[in-house]
Amino acid sequence: MRYQQWRLMLLRSYHRSHLPYLSPCSQVTSISSRSFSSFIHPGIGALQQSEQLCPLRSPMTSSGNLVKSVGRSFSSEPAVEEKSSAEATVIDIFSRLSGEDEIRKELESSGVVISQDLALKVLRKLESNPDVAKSFFQWIKEASPEELSSKNYNMMLRILGGNGLVDEFWGLVDVMKKKGHGLSANVRDKVGDKFQKDGLESDLLRLRKLFTSDCLDNSAENVCDRVCKIVMKEEWGDDVEKRVRDLNVEFKSDLVKMIVERLDVEPRKALLFFRWIDESDLFKHDEKTYNAMARVLGKEKFLDRFQNIVVEMRSAGYEVEIETYVRVSTRFCQTKLIKEAVDLFEIAMAGSSSSNNPTPHCFCLLLKKIVTAKILDMDLFSRAVKVYTKNGNALTDSLLKSVLKSLRSVDRVEQSNELLKEMKRGGYVPSGDMQSMIASSLSRKGKKDEADEFVDFMESSGNNLDDKAMASLVEGYCDSGNLDEALVCFEKMVGNTGVSYADYSFEKLVLAYCNKNQVRDAYKLLSAQVTKNQLKPRHSTYKSLVTNLLTKKIARDGGFEEALSLLPIMKDHGFPPFIDPFMSYFSSTGKSTEALGFLKAMTSNNFPYISVVLRVFETMMKSARHSEAQDLLSLCPNYIRNNPDVLELFNTMKPNESAVEKPLAASA
């Protein structure tokens, strides 16, 4: 028989793995290098019936330690935060919402998949909140009844009984019994104490009788315990098979699934049981049990056997369940088996049931793992995008944003264009905001060639970079100190779209020139853009440039005259004059002739503002520059020299009274 053949191979493998001395070679389990992505395509060869098993070094860790929600899958964040986040998210959703569709959409958008383990953790946290617990339990019961195990039922009984909901407690007991689940001692003790405290003697007696009968019956939980004890205790053989048969139990899907999952710590024995029960005609495997076996074998050491089970399951017309995908792909990514994770993604996406297809969040997490791998394999990226979009799914800005963030985290921003090209083949066109983000990240990192390639790529796609994206290029080059390239991009932007939205990027350009001590070049740039392209700089741009032109060294070399020439341009653009830097200049080094030039620049209808005149004189005299103030007064026209306010200022701020800031001025 075929069963006898694979059993002998399994046992032979087991004996070899328990020899006292092993060669280094015998301790290494070979991992098939073949891809099983072809399983989803027609023309697949006949299913291999024999299982090639290799020696095992140690039992596998319990699957209970694996992540149960999509939000945890592939994540590079700390595990503790993710686990608590999934439970908190579920509790928040069921505390706020009541509609089935609302809840389903919220769970999907949060990237949470309800599994048996996650359901149990949520119920434990809701022990003192029976209303939300009932809502949550009822929703799972209707939406995913297969995710309710004996432990889940017992936890719900504990909540109902512990909160005095006696009728609902007994109602759930009846439902639970029909499903073959038994009452746990923990529930008996907890609820029994509550019944006794509330004086519910008849209910207490009924509870005790129920537990006694459960200990003697063939509930799924009890049968599972007995089968697992037999299988785990001894080496597999005729005696083990006979003892399991002698239990005289009817094996149903939930029971077989439970046993296989319980044997997770011994994957080899789980597979022996799985094969034997089918070959012995005790049970015909279905989608539920195949997936349970796949979850147990979905580990690096059992890769070949996992692949065989998946092929067999698909050939039988069954699909990879979402929980299987999440658990196994998580393990694959944790052990750097990125190619195998993509293979599994292709198979899971090929399923006809949308509820079993990996979610957009799953897809995003897989792409993030691909781009942060030791070597970025664009073929894997392309395969994942292709199979995802083939199912009618759309690629989004939020997806690309998340993937690019991961790409930057491993300092591969220069490969952004490669990702973008692959996504374009999937029908994706980046929005203006995404264009800006990509342009900024490339130029800030000084990746000129890649930035040029990005611009060319967008133009060849018939989608020229919009003004915001071009501005981001300019800003990025400014931040990286590449002023020449920043200027080229700015002029290209103005040539393509005009100056309507160029004011912010122009300010960045001016500031970058100033920071590079090229202030006068910034002035020339502003003058040229205003004259040639009718650019209207921001008021803040004028302020920054004027302030920098009036620094001591630059002002002496012609900066003062240039700053002065900006005042009428500011006025033409509707901005008030910015005179504070001029006052600072006159208080220290400004000459009387320069002050007169400033007053002329501030003249309106042939008369300067008297308030400005008074401020200039006062600034000079407060700084003990009385001689410069007198020289300026002598250069002013009569209407200023004879102005009462001016005369009063000079009378009250005589040298011996006004030299408060510079005592040495008293000797001037």
UniProtKB/Swiss-Prot annotation:
It comes from the Eukaryota. Keywords: Mitochondrion, Repeat, Ribonucleoprotein, Ribosomal protein, Transit peptide. It is found in: Mitochondrion. Gene3D superfamilies: Tetratricopeptide repeat domain. PPR repeats lie at residues 286-320, 321-355, 396-430, 431-465, 466-496, 502-537, 543-577. One of its GO terms (molecular function) is mRNA binding. InterPro entries: BIR6-like, Pentatricopeptide_rpt, TPR-like_helical_dom_sf. Residues 1-36 form a transit peptide. GO terms for cellular component: mitochondrion; ribonucleoprotein complex; ribosome. GO terms for biological process: RNA splicing. Component of the mitochondrial ribosome small subunit. Belongs to the PPR family. P subfamily. This is Small ribosomal subunit protein mS81 (rPPR8). It comes from Arabidopsis thaliana (Mouse-ear cress).
